Design a protein with these regions (language model features):
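Aromatic-lined carbohydrate-binding/catalytic grooves of carbohydrate-active enzymes
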Residues: 87-243
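Catalytic and substrate-binding clefts that recognize carbohydrates or anionic sugar/phosphate headgroups
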Residues: 1-93, 99-102, 110-112, 118-123
Length: 243
């Protein structure tokens, strides 16, 4: 996998499963290393030997766990015994979750469009349980034009967010809004959050601005929220509730 040449991923974990097509038996490979790495899954071809797989990492040790199966299910069980189990998902998360950037990007009345979509799923007998709300809901005017600013609402698209959420709940739908974990430098709440000491400090590798690290976010440069701090997590939760 190469992020520069293929579709980007939100994260990658150096774990994979190899299945023998003949025996139908599997084995898991987990490389316990957080450094940047790449895998060659048998794509290499040389004239003197058969195709082979390889692993390369920029730093750290080759700390490899071979996880016995023979079934894929048993490998996953043992892999999660090693790394930790995920929290049990809510039942609704196992159902159909609607999602579309189209509705939140409409010039106006996105709220009505989403409600109409949910009503249509009911009419067509599609048992929808949730809706992933794309970030168009928080696209608002700033000093540098329209930007997606977490914890704001575009009131042309969502006229009364509280009422809209109530209507979705009434229809049995759990809404999962896209909440970006960074604050643009033009964000209207930036100074308030700075005063609450919610951002990562600058470093030797990132001079930043005003002593705070800066990265590239959707819409331009912004600050990194420091979720390692208990106080930041509490402030963040309160912003979600208030919004």
């Amino acid at each position: 996998y190469n992020a520069k040449e293929t579709d980007s991923l939100y994260k990658h974990i150096p774990f994979y499963i190899r299945l023998n097509r003949g025996t139908k038996q599997a084995v898991g490979y987990f490389y316990h290393n957080t450094a940047e790495c790449d895998f060659n899954m048998g794509r290499e071809k040389r004239n003197y030997w058969h195709r082979y797989s390889s692993y390369r990492t920029d730093a750290g040790d080759i700390d490899l766990f071979l996880i016995a199966g023979p079934s894929i299910r048993e490998i996953i069980e043992r892999y999660t015994d090693l790394t930790g189990k995920s929290v049990m998902l809510p039942k609704a998360a196992l159902g159909y979750l609607g999602s579309s950037m189209y509705y939140p990007e409409l010039p106006e009345n996105s709220d009505d469009a989403v409600l109409d979509f949910i009503d249509t799923t009911r009419e067509e007998g599609i048992p929808a349980d949730g809706f992933q709300l794309s970030s168009g809901y928080c696209a608002v005017e700033t000093a540098e034009g329209i930007k997606r600013c977490t914890f704001t609402w575009n009131n042309k698209r969502f006229k009364d967010p509280a009422d809209w959420f109530a209507q979705m709940v009434k229809r049995g739908i759990i809404v999962s809004p896209n909440i970006k974990p960074g604050m643009l430098l033009v964000h209207p709440l930036l100074e308030e959050m700075k005063a609450k000491d919610m951002f990562l400090p600058a470093s030797d590798d990132n001079a930043g601005v005003d002593g705070l690290a800066v990265g590239t976010w959707w819409g331009g440069p912004g600050l990194f929220v420091d979720f390692t701090k208990q106080s930041t997590r509490e402030h963040w939760k309160q912003y979600i509730k208030d919004t």
